[in-house]
Structure formats: C-alpha cells, structure tokens
Amino acid sequence: GISVSTSVMEFDYEGYKVNILDTPGHQDFAEDTFRTLTAVDSAIIVVDGAKGVETQTRKLMEVCRMRNTPVIVFVNKMDREGRDPFDLLDELEEELHIKVRPLSWPINIGAKFKGVYNIYENKLDLFKPDKQRVTEKVEVDIASPDLATHIGEQDAQQLRDDLELIDGVYPEFDVETYRSAEVAPVFFGSALNNFGVQELLNCFVKIAPSPRPTK
C-alpha cells in the first residue's frame, strides 16, 4: 500500500528524541507532503534502486532546496534487481542538483545482495535473505584477507575497488556541508526487510541539526 497522508511518530533513540513526519510519496498526495516539508529541520528522501530519481523526487528536492533543508538519501530495494549504484549516484547529482557522498555501499544487488559496507562506521553489515535482517556486524579491515571469508574473494575485491573509487571521486564527508544542504549523504538498503535502516538512523541522530524554533 501507499501513504495517503502524513503520519507523525516520536521515539527515543540512543539518548535522542526523534520526531518523524512520514509523508506520502505518491504524486497524487504531493500537496500534503510539500506542506509538511515546511515544518521539518532535515529530510530523508527514499529512492527506488530500480527506478532512480522520479518526478516526485525532483519536486521534493526543490522544496528542500528553497528552504535550505539538509537531505539524506536512502536508496531502497537493494535486494531486488536494479541500477548500478554509481549510475544512481550520478543521477542523484544531475537530477537533484546536489553533491552526494555515499556513507554505506552495497555488496552486490538483487538475488546476490550480501549486505552493505558501512563507510560511516567502518563495519561490514551482512544480510541473509532468508532471515530478512542484519545477521552479523563485522569490524574488518577492508584490506584484510578476512574480508573474503565473509563475502567471497570476488565480491571482496570488487568492494575494495568500489571504495577506492568512492574515496577518489567524492570528498571526505563533512557534517557542516550536510547541515548547510550542500552535500547529501547516501545510504543503501532494503526498507521492507529493515536492512540498512538502523545504520542510517545511527548516523542521522549524530549529524542531523537540532530542531529550530519556529517563527
């Protein structure tokens, strides 16, 4: 199903009080979403890993840009067949007119999806589709041979190559450039399986701006 109106949630997490306004993503209910965006201090935009940037995504970003609202992007459905992650990053920058910086990175996609490397925390988050959750968090040196014991030699080498390219192409993440809405951190995962969501939340509570008083 789809959301047809904004839902409000409040919860405590890691010593922080988090207020979430879950807005409709479908364009038929865009007015409610745009109105809600005027009341938030930061936004998380969910992008379908197969469809990429859609018309509604562009409109949401326009509102965030007008209000100078910091944005985090969550690329969803990595456990399904989809687009190349680097192509998605290029599209995000070109279509949303904002620089991006991946803070997690998928290890394969679709049926071969094994998890993500959490760049922000330097951890390997492994995914088992039969259990539909993070089954193991591993602190492993990306250059260590131990990496291959967890994800296989081929995927280990591909991950090393991808992370090297990321470090070469994208600037090191700086919190202030995010808070000033110049850079959008990007996370990958599968919301349906609750995979990658906690990693995003762990980062969000540390970097998102505190609520500002409304006028």
Task: Map each language-model feature to its residues.
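Structural and coupling elements of P-loop NTPases
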Residues: 1-215
